[in-house]
Curated annotation (Swiss-Prot):
CDD domains: YitT_C_like_1
The family this protein is said to belong to: Belongs to the UPF0316 family.
Compartments, record wording: Cell membrane
Superkingdom of the source species: Bacteria
The entry's keywords: Cell membrane, Membrane, Transmembrane, Transmembrane helix
HAMAP family per record: UPF0316
Cellular component annotations (GO), alphabetically ordered: plasma membrane
Keyword Metal-binding attributed: no
Protein's UniProt name: UPF0316 protein lp_1140
């Protein structure tokens, strides 16, 4: 059995590129970026057909299949890393604070975050509950502010499907007005 290293590298790179693009495209679809996702899918399927044909035409060498699978696994990982760095969309953070007089809402507002707060009651008494909508690109900074100001906070994050009105609508309108003046 002859091992063609150039072919193995090519198979790995093609499947790595295909799956990386596939992962990013899937996440674009989930976040509603239809046009980018459609464009990515055209490139993705072209790469897929190339890679699959290379492997299917060389099934006599099982190492080709192993390298194809390795490219797949690495592609999924890298695709997720890319999506994490792009940080598309928004995150909704719910924070429950044991101290109803916590300074955290003020700290978050001073740092540009919109915060809705209301009184809550838990097993051990009164609590303060915060709801914060933030772009995912600011998520790590937000978590850092929460951890610094309220290390005992209970934090839950989830991805909103639909956003309308409120703090974000006002902010977007102000930003658009500033751009028109420039």
């Amino acid at each position: 059995m002859h091992i063609d290293m150039g072919m193995l590298v090519l198979i790995f790179i093609i499947n790595f590129a295909y799956i990386t693009l596939n992962t990013v495209r899937f996440l674009l679809v989930m976040r509603g970026y239809r046009y980018f996702a459609a464009f990515a899918s055209v490139i993705e399927i072209t790469i897929y057909v190339l890679g699959l044909s290379l492997v299917l035409n060389r099934l006599n060498n099982p190492i080709n299949l192993v390298v194809y699978a390795l490219g797949y696994g690495v592609g999924v990982y890298v695709g997720m890393v890319i999506e994490d760095r792009l940080a598309l969309g928004y995150t909704m953070i719910s924070v429950i604070l044991p101290d109803p007089k916590s300074s955290l809402p003020g700290v978050l507002r001073e740092n540009g975050f919109g915060v809705t707060q209301h009184a809550a009651y838990g097993l051990e008494g009164e609590r303060l509950e915060l709801e914060i909508l933030a772009p995912r690109k600011n998520e790590r900074r937000l978590y850092g502010l929460i951890k610094d100001a309220a290390p005992n906070a209970f934090v839950i994050a989830y991805e909103p499907r639909y956003i309308s009105g409120g703090f974000w609508l006002k902010r977007v309108k102000r930003r658009n007005a500033r751009r028109k003046k420039q």
